[in-house]
């Protein structure tokens, strides 16, 4: 199998996607023949930096491969860790990245998205002085003392818990429709209503923790699908500080923390496992990811792995939102199942929703249909190759696999296939990675209780 003059040999190929080329295998083969040093760095909030020192070929015949390798590397760093400024010490690659990361370039989506998230113009900088890596992880979570509120803001329901010294004394779920509502007062009132409902069951409120889908920097809502329909001017004015305002208006000056729901899932994993260094991957509507490091801290990385490239196949499926190809969202969520099902001979109603399409394959899998088995085996191969790639970036000990794609017999087959690929393709990593499905203890902790543990009380 060859891409851009780089040849890769695989033991495990997805039966329904024979052109799949794992990013890690491409990178390894590329670096075997690369000899010219190049350094780059991506800067994000609070002066944090992710630096990479690597090599390229630097020859005219390998120029396309060099550009592709650097493009995928920068994209990975941007969506894994976040950033608004790229530093690079190679003039040709600087010119290339500058032409891509602009309003008219191939990475216009990433350029605009990151500028919005970090509230700074996106820049590409040529320099010989590449800044070194600097992380400022936040100690967050695992605090169960006192009277706490945990709020989990979902896209179709919101859940709140009142927790006293680690015991949940009240919990409620309320259906709401945040994604279709353009008025941020609707969201604000829903949040305050939930907070007050929990507070009524405790003598006082010592701390409030919030879990929600989206990107949160310093507790501020920088991007979130809950507020999809809110106009941009109102978003700036009313949404970015919405959780902070709701908590302060209701309880005054209490400690609070707002975190991405993926990070809170990983935190719930650490609480149920009694150990740290957990990557949580929820395969549902999208690929939602969170990470708690070896010290039990949330890293401040974006962990938006749905946008991280996993496949070097130039004909990989396009993600409609970002316009890019070969990224996690088309492999590790219901889109991945629905992409492969027709290739296995499973007929799907094109007018059905993605969730309804997924149910067709799941139902066939429960009946041991061999077509459905091919779908889950193929995703298991994707995942085995990709977890080895993620491992080299994170160094996690546990992977917690969540979401509707992982449920039932399909999830079991996916997991077994993934384990086999790790064992046979990546023996140097396999014994260091423990794959986990959510157990009863994890469900007992739950998202809202883990959220309640986020802030340290006074």
Model-assigned labels for residue ranges:
Residues 185-201, 382, 386:
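Short, well-ordered amphipathic alpha-helical segments that serve as non-catalytic structural scaffolds
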């Amino acid at each position: 199998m060859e891409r851009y003059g780089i040849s890769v040999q695989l033991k495990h190929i997805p039966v329904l996607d024979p052109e799949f080329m794992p990013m890690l295998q491409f990178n390894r083969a590329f670096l075997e023949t690369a000899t010219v040093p190049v350094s780059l760095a991506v800067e994000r909030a609070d002066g944090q930096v992710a630096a990479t020192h690597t090599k390229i070929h630097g020859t005219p015949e390998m120029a396309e491969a060099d550009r592709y390798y650097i493009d995928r590397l920068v994209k990975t760093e941007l969506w894994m860790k976040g950033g608004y400024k790229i530093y690079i010490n190679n003039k040709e690659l600087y010119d290339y990245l500058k032409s891509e990361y602009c309003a008219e370039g191939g990475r216009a989506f990433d350029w605009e998205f990151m500028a919005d998230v970090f509230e700074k113009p996106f820049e590409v900088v040529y320099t010989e002085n590449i800044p070194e890596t600097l992380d400022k992880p936040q100690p967050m979570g695992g605090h169960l003392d006192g009277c706490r509120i945990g709020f989990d803001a979902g896209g179709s329901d919101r859940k709140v818990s009142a927790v006293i010294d680690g015991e949940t004394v009240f919990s409620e779920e309320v259906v709401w429709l945040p994604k279709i509502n353009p008025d941020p007062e609707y969201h604000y009132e829903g949040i305050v209503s939930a907070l007050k409902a929990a507070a009524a069951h405790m003598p006082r409120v010592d701390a409030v923790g919030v879990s929600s889908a989206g990107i949160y920097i310093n507790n501020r809502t920088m991007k979130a699908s809950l507020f999809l329909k809110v106009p941009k001017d109102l978003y700036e004015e009313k949404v970015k500080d919405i959780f902070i305002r709701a908590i302060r208006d209701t309880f005054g000056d209490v400690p609070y923390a707002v975190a991405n729901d993926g990070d809170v899932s990983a935190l719930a994993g650490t609480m149920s496992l009694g150990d740290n260094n957990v990557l949580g991957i929820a395969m549902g509507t999208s690929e939602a990811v969170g990470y708690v490091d070896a010290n039990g801290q949330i890293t401040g990385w974006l962990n938006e792995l749905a946008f991280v490239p996993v496949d070097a196949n130039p004909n990989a499926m396009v993600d409609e939102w970002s316009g890019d190809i070969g990224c996690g969202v088309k492999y590790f969520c219901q889109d991945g199942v629905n992409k492969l099902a027709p290739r296995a001979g499973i007929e799907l109603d094109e007018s059905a929703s993605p969730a309804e399409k997924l149910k067709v394959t799941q139902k066939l899998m429960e009946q041991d249909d061999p077509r459905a088995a091919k779908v889950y085996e193929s995703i298991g191969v994707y995942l085995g190759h990709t977890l080895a790639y993620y491992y080299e970036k994170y160094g996690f000990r546990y992977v917690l696999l969540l979401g509707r794609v992982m449920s039932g017999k399909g999830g079991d087959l996916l997991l077994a296939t993934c384990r086999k690929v790790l064992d046979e393709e990546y023996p140097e990593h396999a014994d260091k990675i423990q794959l986990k499905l959510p157990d009863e203890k994890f469900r007992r902790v739950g998202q809202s209780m883990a959220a309640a543990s986020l802030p340290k009380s006074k």
